[in-house]
């Protein structure tokens, strides 16, 4: 663990806090948890708890909240745990300070709305040849913070780097598998948020458990078709960062994407649902995911139905009826 003595987690949310605690527990001597909110930093420093985002979980003694982005200059490892649409701005702020050999683990899931770039592409666009890895998989911050068994995937094009980075976050209850299939891991993490909105809508509309299971299975087929168009490994999509994350996100009220869809299914307006739930990554990813699918000639009817609802081209009931009216076909057609 001596290799990762100084770690910086960019993002003071629940997931950033949980990962910062893991890094401290894994042996890092100094873990800086950065957020731009000075009042939030003062609260965490005074109480030893991130009461706003992860209440009831003590901060490790090696963890120090800060608003100073200059801490990245001395870091051995950076965890980027900010919303996907904010990643570029944060990386631009640290670009001149970040030492070139310092690895960056991207812990956000999505596609940049304005450019259609995946998170690793955003990092490359801003930072050039900085070593980058991606962390994704079925995980809720509270589960990890409370020591509940969780398994995730860490991907880097450099397989040796991926294997080495595992030790920075490993814990008896937090198991990391590594891979070189960065794009496959990113696709799973981005697409599942959109599909979870569909499952939430179905649950909110009280369509039943059978409909929910069908949406997961057919959503996974869409995920696989999309991934194949990008040349990713099917085993990655069938693993933790693909199917695993899809199942978790599509079946739990802890998921903001699922909860957002559930609210829409209950008749809540899009604006009210967003205001009540907070950041919904799938809301921002949906349009660009479908744009990429259309550009690649990939059929994604569930994702397209969600897009139509979010763009207010269709109501919830019309979108459901449209999916149910699709012609019957062989189950594995196009899979």
From Swiss-Prot:
Q: Which residues bind NADPH?
A: 15, 36, 109, 141, 256, 279, 281
Q: Where is the active site?
A: 192 (proton acceptor)
Q: Which residues bind sn-glycerol 3-phosphate?
A: 109, 137, 139, 192, 245, 255-257
Q: Name a GO CC annotation attached to this entry.
A: cytosol
**Enzyme Commission designation:** 1.1.1.94
* Location in the cell: Cytoplasm
The reactions it catalyses are: sn-glycerol 3-phosphate + NAD(+) = dihydroxyacetone phosphate + NADH + H(+); sn-glycerol 3-phosphate + NADP(+) = dihydroxyacetone phosphate + NADPH + H(+)
Q: In which pathway does it act?
A: Membrane lipid metabolism; glycerophospholipid metabolism
Q: Can the keyword NAD be found in this entry's annotation?
A: yes
Its GO biological process annotations read: carbohydrate metabolic process; glycerol-3-phosphate biosynthetic process; glycerol-3-phosphate catabolic process; glycerophospholipid metabolic process; phospholipid biosynthetic process
Swiss-Prot/TrEMBL keywords: Cytoplasm, Lipid biosynthesis, Lipid metabolism, NAD, NADP, Nucleotide-binding, Oxidoreductase, Phospholipid biosynthesis, Phospholipid metabolism
Q: Which PROSITE patterns match?
A: NAD_G3PDH
In Gene Ontology terms, what is one molecular function of this protein? glycerol-3-phosphate dehydrogenase [NAD(P)+] activity
- Protein family: Belongs to the NAD-dependent glycerol-3-phosphate dehydrogenase family.
- Sum up the protein's function in the record's words: Catalyzes the reduction of the glycolytic intermediate dihydroxyacetone phosphate (DHAP) to sn-glycerol 3-phosphate (G3P), the key precursor for phospholipid synthesis.
Q: What is this protein called?
A: Glycerol-3-phosphate dehydrogenase [NAD(P)+]
Please tell me the species this chain comes from. Beijerinckia indica subsp. indica (strain ATCC 9039 / DSM 1715 / NCIMB 8712)
């Amino acid at each position: 663990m001596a290799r990762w003595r100084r770690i910086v987690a960019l993002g003071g949310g629940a997931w950033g806090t949980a990962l910062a605690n893991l890094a401290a527990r894994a042996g890092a001597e100094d873990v800086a948890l950065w957020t731009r909110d000075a009042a939030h930093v003062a609260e965490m420093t005074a109480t030893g708890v991130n009461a706003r985002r992860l209440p009831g979980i003590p901060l490790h003694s090696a963890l120090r909240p800060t608003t100073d982005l200059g801490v990245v200059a001395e870091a051995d490892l950076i965890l980027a745990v900010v919303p996907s649409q904010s990643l570029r701005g944060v990386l631009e702020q640290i670009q001149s300070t970040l030492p070139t050999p310092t690895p960056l683990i991207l812990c956000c899931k999505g596609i940049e709305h304005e450019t259609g770039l995946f998170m690793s592409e955003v990092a490359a666009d801003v930072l050039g040849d900085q070593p980058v890895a991606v962390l994704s998989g079925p995980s809720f911050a509270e589960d990890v913070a409370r020591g509940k068994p969780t398994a995730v995937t860490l991907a880097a094009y450099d397989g040796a780097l991926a294997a080495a980075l595992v030790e920075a976050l490993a814990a008896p209850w937090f198991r990391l598998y590594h891979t070189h299939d960065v794009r496959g891991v990113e696709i799973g993490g981005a697409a599942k948020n959109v599909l979870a909105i569909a499952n939430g809508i179905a649950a909110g509309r009280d369509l039943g458990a059978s409909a929910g299971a069908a949406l997961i299975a057919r959503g996974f087929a869409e995920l696989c078709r999309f991934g194949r168009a990008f040349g990713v490994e099917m085993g990655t999509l069938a693993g933790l960062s693909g199917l695993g994350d899809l199942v978790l996100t599509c079946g739990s009220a802890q998921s903001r994407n699922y909860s957002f869809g559930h609210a829409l299914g209950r008749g809540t307006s899009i604006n009210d649902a967003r205001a009540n739930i907070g950041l919904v990554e799938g809301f921002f990813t949906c349009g660009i995911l479908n744009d990429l699918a259309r550009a690649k000639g990939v059929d994604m009817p569930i994702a397209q139905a969600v897009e139509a609802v979010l763009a207010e081209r269709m109501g919830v009931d019309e979108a459901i009826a449209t999916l149910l009216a699709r012609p019957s076909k062989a189950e594995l057609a196009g899979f």
